[in-house]
Amino acid sequence: MKYQVVIGLEVHTQLTTNTKIFCGCSTRFGAEPNSQTCPVCLGLPGALPVLNQQVVEYAIRAGLATNCSITKRNVFARKNYFYPDLPKGYQISQFDLPICQHGHLDIEVEGEKKRIGITRIHMEEDAGKLVHADIPGVDDSCVDLNRACTPLLEIVSEPDMRSPDEAIAYLKKLHQIVMYLGICDGNLEEGSFRCDANVSLMPVGSNVFGTRAELKNINSFKFIKQAIEYEIERQAEILDDGGKVVQETRLFDPNTGTTRSMRGKEEAHDYRYFPDPDLVPVIISDDWIEKVRGGLPELPEAKRARFMSEGGAVFGGSAFGLPEYDAEVLVASRELAQYFEDTVALFPQAKTVSNWVMGEVTRALNDDNNRSIAECPVTPALLADLLKLMEKGTISGKIAKTVFDEMYKTGKASEKIVEEKGLVQVSDTGAIEAMVDEVLEKNPGQVAEYRGGKETLFGFFVGQVMRASKGKANPAVVNELLLKKLNS
């Protein structure tokens, strides 16, 4: 039997506030265990939560960027369950009145566009974490409560995705948006952006969803895709054998590429939500929403369209007329797009700048332990100066790449490197003509073959002249003189 895949995603994004959602403790990652705690996040008797206003603003940002409606009256609820890393015995979250509802994101997979619904976005606090002893024969686990009370947004999609590729496209777009908004650092390995996937199968043509399995806390796009693919195969095999899929929570094992049961439906929590009596409702006014809307950055989709638009100024900045591929690569990160725009502002040849940013700049960063563009020692101003030297003919494109590598290593300006290393391009016709004559004189056989119709040898002659000039000869002058002499 053929089956239709049904996928819904729950994404937890850890917010980049300096302090926690209900107390003033730091949210810095990697601190000594239990060093960023207080009576509130330790759940001590009598400690009362105080809401961090920035969390609400970040939630509004996320809602506006994902086409949600913003709930005007927000209530926090207690989600009751026991776990060693949850000191209060409950988690403060939102239940029936989430801050954002009824949104959507548009994705594209293999040229096909599709709208994925977003059911809700709600604010909540994170739990602590268990640290398991990595010692043979020791089964102890320790509790680190530094993460307890860290602010989260849970973004819940509709079950609208019908393939692993659609799920990944949605996740990557959401990941890009929260990073553009500056509300999450997007670090999957550190758990700043983590995902639970609900996967089920139904017969093709049916409109009744099958029994779903929930795949928990997967921390990379690669593993999310692997987990969903495995789960599809597992459920299909059960159904083909006449069995029934059990509703359960499953964990993905990246070492084996498989999922294993964590708990079944009968073990599922009854969270017994009720309004938190220690927190008053949060009222969000239209003025507040519009103030947040006015501070939103240009989002990836709009920036991509602007980068591809032809000429002139458009809403959000300048249009550059770039190919779709270039725009897609440059918009991948807000910082990379800004680096490109800052360089074009100083050297207004967008395609040339795009080629260099996607080529030499990205290559150098990748070779340097995948450094971020923010850490690039070649600033937009330095890159623009290098490109100006190339445009003026002071150096050739080949020499420019050599100069760039030196700039990256030393942070020096291109002009200084060119001067120190004597790399100024030779454009003197007389000097280049002497080199051309010498090359032709030394290679009479190749000259005869070229004149006999083997025109592919032209590149050989160019290479010989460039070698003789140590790469300094102006290629345009070399080509012109060679053509003139070989065809005379």
Curated annotation (Swiss-Prot):
Keywords per UniProt: ATP-binding, Ligase, Nucleotide-binding, Protein biosynthesis
One matching Pfam family: GatB_Yqey
Molecular function per GO: asparaginyl-tRNA synthase (glutamine-hydrolyzing) activity; ATP binding; glutaminyl-tRNA synthase (glutamine-hydrolyzing) activity
Gene3D superfamilies: 1.10.10.410, GatB domain, N-terminal subdomain (1.10.150.380)
Alphabetical GO biological process terms: glutaminyl-tRNAGln biosynthesis via transamidation; translation
InterPro entries reported in the protein's UniProt record: Asn/Gln-tRNA_amidoTrfase_suB/E, Asn/Gln-tRNA_Trfase_suB/E_cat, Asn/Gln_amidotransferase, Asn/Gln_tRNA_amidoTrase-B-like, GatB, GatB_C_1, GatB_Yqey_C_2, Gln-tRNA_amidoTrfase_suB_CS
PROSITE patterns: GATB
The enzyme's E.C. designation: 6.3.5.-
Reaction(s) catalysed (UniProt annotation): L-glutamyl-tRNA(Gln) + L-glutamine + ATP + H2O = L-glutaminyl-tRNA(Gln) + L-glutamate + ADP + phosphate + H(+); L-aspartyl-tRNA(Asn) + L-glutamine + ATP + H2O = L-asparaginyl-tRNA(Asn) + L-glutamate + ADP + phosphate + 2 H(+)
Homology family: Belongs to the GatB/GatE family. GatB subfamily.
Record text on subunit structure and interactions: Heterotrimer of A, B and C subunits.
HAMAP family: GatB
Function as written in the Swiss-Prot or TrEMBL entry: Allows the formation of correctly charged Asn-tRNA(Asn) or Gln-tRNA(Gln) through the transamidation of misacylated Asp-tRNA(Asn) or Glu-tRNA(Gln) in organisms which lack either or both of asparaginyl-tRNA or glutaminyl-tRNA synthetases. The reaction takes place in the presence of glutamine and ATP through an activated phospho-Asp-tRNA(Asn) or phospho-Glu-tRNA(Gln).
Full protein name: Aspartyl/glutamyl-tRNA(Asn/Gln) amidotransferase subunit B
Originating species: Citrifermentans bemidjiense (strain ATCC BAA-1014 / DSM 16622 / JCM 12645 / Bem) (Geobacter bemidjiensis)
Encoding gene per record: gatB
